[in-house]
Amino acid sequence: MSLDAAVKKQIITEFGTKEGDTGSPEVQVALLSRRISDLTEHLKTHKHDHHSRRGLLILVGQRRRLLQYLAKKDIQRFRALVERLGIRRGAAGAR
């Protein structure tokens, strides 16, 4: 499940540090979080969709690795992002 261009652009402008910023960890984590929430809603109605469940686990792992990287590089940015997205610290992978 992919995001449509309008939603993606809105997330990029909200979490980006400058115009056209698509590669910062904050933007990447925000995009992954949106895809994760969309897939979670999909799996609530389609319980036996195991291919999508595997995709969800892959996305969660990618987000966890990006959050670990951000926590290692800049703990203040990590804490601000976790607070903005409402992610649990244990799910974020850093203490």
UniProtKB/Swiss-Prot annotation:
Family matches, as SUPFAM superfamilies: S15/NS1 RNA-binding domain
Coiled coil, from the record: none
Entry GO terms, CC: cytosolic small ribosomal subunit
Name this protein carries in UniProt: Small ribosomal subunit protein uS15
GO biological process: translation
Species for this entry: Streptomyces coelicolor (strain ATCC BAA-471 / A3(2) / M145)
CDD domains named in the record: Ribosomal_S15p_S13e
Keywords associated with the record: Ribonucleoprotein, Ribosomal protein, RNA-binding, rRNA-binding
Role, per record: One of the primary rRNA binding proteins, it binds directly to 16S rRNA where it helps nucleate assembly of the platform of the 30S subunit by binding and bridging several RNA helices of the 16S rRNA. Forms an intersubunit bridge (bridge B4) with the 23S rRNA of the 50S subunit in the ribosome.
Subunit details: Part of the 30S ribosomal subunit. Forms a bridge to the 50S subunit in the 70S ribosome, contacting the 23S rRNA.
Annotated family: Belongs to the universal ribosomal protein uS15 family.
Gene Ontology molecular function, alphabetical: rRNA binding; structural constituent of ribosome
UniProt xrefs under NCBIfam families: S15_bact (TIGR00952)
